[in-house]
């Protein structure tokens, strides 16, 4: 249950976007109301997009007045919307006086996928990611995570729905464990957004203890930012690998999907020219994943200022993919979307206060 810490700029009123179902039920019990009120309020907030208690006509006037006195519905403030030539949309959201995050909608055939951020910045320093350049400022609250979905859904036409959510935006979701889990529960709640567990995907760089914790409380889809077939190279690209090396990470992935192997882990692999894209890398990746229920998503690198990397040539990516497919690995190559509005994978940067000096060094304890 999310205990819903009160945001720093509201000392008395609870932001109801911070509450998953259990938290909302507990909130109503504290008010002396029946727990079923939680379902009513979740529908008003998440399905209808209502933030004015006065419009919630199936609640008594007395209850509406009490809610007004002790709580609020405060999504992040939308400060900028951009549309790409390919249909991708990016929303820049103000989450406090100095910080902004970005969320991206990727429309495709028969689906609308929303890429959601979990932190302001990121502490993991992956060398190919522009978000890592800005450092880390803070975790997002549950309200700020689910608020991205709230804003996006209610910016779409009435007949359109967000069909998939991927926690692949700014930040490492497993380093904001409680708030992320609470937000995913709201995503899947039938009285909120009603997404199936297969349509909610969490992408992690490999925080092994937190991945094991996730297996205990959730079974949403899992993606892993792998990007290299061996520890030496991954240590350079994804420094958290020095704490949780590939062998430990793959073992945790196998524990997550369970013994029946009915689901597959998606392994993300950014294609960097001359770095991790040679034929021997492809063959090593085949060997590495041979005993893990997996599929591979190859990601063409998206350049950003002062990056040391270049994207692999399309022919190189195609040959790499063919090697994996010939070995029986399900392999896809991600379409590059939203590059003209800096919304492509690895390009989200937002706005972080004093970004270089306030990098947060997390103690990743078991």
From Swiss-Prot:
Binding site for [4Fe-4S] cluster: 122, 126, 129
First-listed, main subcellular location of the protein, grouped into a coarse class: cytoplasm
Any one biological process term the GO annotation gives: tRNA methylation
Pfam families: Radical_SAM, RlmN_N
Keywords: 4Fe-4S, Cytoplasm, Disulfide bond, Iron, Iron-sulfur, Metal-binding, Methyltransferase, rRNA processing, S-adenosyl-L-methionine, Transferase, tRNA processing
Keyword Acetylation: no
EC number(s) on file: 2.1.1.192
Intrachain S-S bonds: 115-345
Job of this protein: Specifically methylates position 2 of adenine 2503 in 23S rRNA and position 2 of adenine 37 in tRNAs. m2A2503 modification seems to play a crucial role in the proofreading step occurring at the peptidyl transferase center and thus would serve to optimize ribosomal fidelity.
Family from the record: Belongs to the radical SAM superfamily. RlmN family.
Designated name of the protein: Dual-specificity RNA methyltransferase RlmN
Gene it is expressed from: rlmN
